[in-house]
């Protein structure tokens, strides 16, 4: 959820759009939770080849998600961050561990830069009080820059991301078409047939 990650996403969109198998040179993005949130940041960078986005089960503010009401979210957020911290270690995911064990030297060399990653949970706990510079990472402050059609879904009872996302729906002011489907349900229901 950083400006560097959004820039990487811009590059991915433009790289994929230039592949010979991409019809008309345009791509869309779809994803639930982290991939949904990430595409909001990417779309705000306005990649020329991005056709539309479908973010599902997202949040509007990273800090308020981690510190709702000023109290550290030691439930889902802590567990989610701990899992990410484990996965970013060298060989921290089954697929990269298997590639290394099979002798993939490029994968092994790429994994060496993993030591540059920081402890997300420790970082999140350190931000006890909202700081003005955190606004740069507020999802809600980026969505007014999105200039492609948006289909966004979210559950009022989402046990992982909550319902605060609805506060930013009015801010999709530059998107030529928007459709928001809000429903009673849970986090993974963004993929369900009911939406």
Regions found by a protein language model. Give the residues of each.
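Active-site nucleophile loop of the alpha/beta-hydrolase fold
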Residues: 32-34, 54-63, 184-187
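Accessory cap/linker subdomain of secreted extracellular hydrolases
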Residues: 41-145
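Gly/Ser-rich "nucleophile elbow"/oxyanion-hole loop immediately N-terminal to the catalytic nucleophile
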Residues: 1-4, 11-28, 33
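Short beta-strand/loop motif that positions the catalytic acidic residue
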Residues: 146, 152-154
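Post-His helix in hydrolase/transferase enzymes
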Residues: 4, 190-195
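Conserved alpha/beta-hydrolase "acid-adjacent" motif
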Residues: 159-166
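Catalytic histidine neighborhood in serine/cysteine hydrolases
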Residues: 173-189
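Active-site loop->helix "elbow" adjoining a glycine-rich segment at hydrolase catalytic centers
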Residues: 30-38, 46
